[in-house]
Amino acid sequence: MKEEKNITPMLAQYHKIKDQYPDALVLYRLGDFYEMFYEDAHTGARELNIVLTKKKVGKDRYIPMCGIPFHSADSYITRLVSKGYKVAICEQLEDASKAKGIVKRDVIRVLTPGTYFENEKLKSALLGIYQERGRFYIAYLDLSTGEFTGGSLNRDELISFIGKFQPKEIVVQEGYDFSDLRSQFKSIFFSQLPEDYFSEDTHSEFLGFFKTGHISAFGFDTEEQNVIYPLSAVWKYAKVTQKSFLPFISTPKPYREDSYVRLDYSAQKHLEIVSPNEGNIPLLRVMDRTLTGMGRRKLRFFLLHPLKNSKEIIKRQNAVTELVENTELREKIRDILDQIFDIERLISKISSNTSTPRDLVGLRESLKKVSKLKEISKEIKSDLLKESFERIEDYSWLIEKLDRYLEDDPPIHLKEGGLIKKGVDKDLDELKEIKEKGNEWLKSYQEKLRKETGIQSLKIGFNKVMGYYIEVTKPNLKLVPDHFRRRQTLSNAERFITDELQSFEEKILSADEKIKALEYEIFMRIREEVAFLSDRIGKTAQQVGMIDAIQSLAQIAVEKGWTKPDIHDGYEIEIKEGYHPVIKEFMPDFVPNNLKMNRNSYFHIITGPNMAGKSTFIRQSAIIILLAQTGSYIPAKKGKIGVVDAIFTRIGSGDALAKGLSTFMVEMLEMANIVNNATERSFIVLDEVGRGTSTYDGLSIGWAISEYLAEKVKVKTLFATHYHELTQLEREIKGVKNFHMDIFEDGENIKFLYRVKEGFSNKSYGVHVAKLAGIKEQIIKRAYEILYYFEEQRDKKLEEDIYSLKQKENSYLNEINELPLFKEIEDIEKDEYRQILEEIESIDIGSITPVEALVFLNDLKKKIKRLKES
């Protein structure tokens, strides 16, 4: 900040502090307000919609200023942090009345989007990224729960991870170009950290904090060792920003994508698992029957991390089944869970010194309910639930202590008193007795004064500004004795003090201050003891979350009448009368559909008009498979699910269009990801491919991709398309089957039946849909005329082109084979031919995609044609 001349000591102090936090809004404590100055004031006033005023700092000199009340600062801070600002809290470090000169102040904490954890409605989580040799080493830290994890990811896995965990802030090493991530995740706040955050000294501090000597102690493999860079950087960032308020952080755990079904960012968005598209509702909201914060987070994790080990799926499924079938047990568990607070968040607040007395009481009451959960563990039969119940620790000793120490209904603020019960501390009890006897003395003294003065309405009161006083109404003022000293005049009364009352006030207020100080001291000791148990209590909270998530899956299954799918390691998938669980909520008459995929029928081409239900059917199929592999029951009459290793989707392109990518480029990038990563065990959903280019280009690419996926990969695929020509693939490739959306026709009118039927649709019904939408009759009539003409031409020419495609391919190859290029290599003298040969030799057959192969072959053909002509 620019130096100013002739400024007050207070402003000089402010400048010194602001210079240390140039990228933060500094909230500078002045009495009962936090003040902002200069540019911070302009920003604060604008973002908080509060008055921008000015402060006089010299003769005819003013600076911009705005302020927020100390007692309601949290709501203002939340608004600033949620908008992506860093906020530095600068507190008074001494009593202003006792300070010599300027009051000591310093920043006690820096709040950022990724580290502000007190507000339960504002999700905060921090992601650190360290890049080396094409790998992304990551560390994820949620200070609100203490969750800490790290891993080694490729770029696609990184994007998927960000989509799943949705951090509010990403920290990277200085100089790292994160512009591509910023453009994709506009709501995330990015921070660059200096090199020392990634240094060996920081590594040593980090390992020392967790009392270990090497990263392998956390379970990281040799090839994951670089994860220490983001882990230690994120830990230091939290430590530097939170200072003495650093909450409990659990021991880092390895995060490995290969433990779960691959669910990339596109699939997360297209299936709307936790984040809906505009105007829609996510799957999570429909599925959620959890009763605790821990359970809600665990259920979210389940949906974003489906299992791919059949034994693990069945183990979780059996736990769900036990609660589905045992209504009494399920309701007993739900009744207990409904009374448990978010223990993980409470532990974070308690360990960070930001908790209130009520937080500790909330923890006490929650642990009582957890003990009740423990009591019913003998009724549990399924392995997974039994493990969770058995891992719940016995905290009866801690509950007893908190019961004995803490009042049942303490105040919100620490220093108001009323925190500690009688019998805890002898000195405290004596002081409380003085105060209680004081109350008796006041009643007695008030009665005495009434008798002496004859003023029956005389009363003794107290307020924080004036202290104790004797109040007499104006009609009785003539009866006031001389030894009453006037303290205050009101509109209808006068207030007085006497020597006796003043002496009592000094004595009782002294006792009250001592009570508050001693209670605060005792409370802080208790809080420290509980904070020491954070790790153990946190592990119990995780088990409560697991139990809650499982009962939630059971509850939704019972409510909706879902069925238990048969999970197996085979290839087949069969779903009978399945439906979309979200759409069904708003369409009770939703039409269910069947899906059967096996070695003879695994690539389904689905045709039919828009609005007929193609997109809904392919999405619901993916969602049902996903739910089955979370261990959930499914929205279907029956299900037989061969475990998949990945769910891929190619639907829509809105987000990427905003980044300046064409529709076609978006499609090709997504298809490249699918083609490069899909295996025979995957499941693919394609909703149109090749829309963003010419009809023939789009059809050719759709055809080539379908051939590759069906012939080479043999991956289970649902391909919804308007390219009716693709239905001819059923004749060419075993496993390709045609399906269409059933339509009822009545003359020129149609009715969508929303049923998937075998065979292909030879009509698009696009004009019918336009008619339903209300397009003018004359346009509809003209559209039919044009449609009939195009269909006639297509029948003559397009089918001929498609059938001759393979012959043309062979013709191209024959042309190439006849060239000197493919005769004796030693006879080739032309540099152009040699260059072409080198290009061919350089191709990696194992990694080239079908689309890349087509482009390469086309370029090669053009080059050879030019050479022949020359």
From Swiss-Prot:
Coiled coil: none
GO cellular component: cytosol
Pfam family of the protein (one): MutS_V
An example Gene Ontology molecular-function term: damaged DNA binding
One Gene Ontology term from the biological process aspect of the record: mismatch repair
Keyword match Membrane: no
Residue numbers binding ATP: G608, P609, N610, M611, A612, G613, K614, S615
Keywords, in A-Z order: ATP-binding, DNA damage, DNA repair, DNA-binding, Nucleotide-binding
Statement: the UniProt record of this protein carries the keyword DNA-binding: yes
Function: This protein is involved in the repair of mismatches in DNA. It is possible that it carries out the mismatch recognition step. This protein has a weak ATPase activity.
Family the entry assigns: Belongs to the DNA mismatch repair MutS family.
Protein name: DNA mismatch repair protein MutS
Organism: Persephonella marina (strain DSM 14350 / EX-H1)
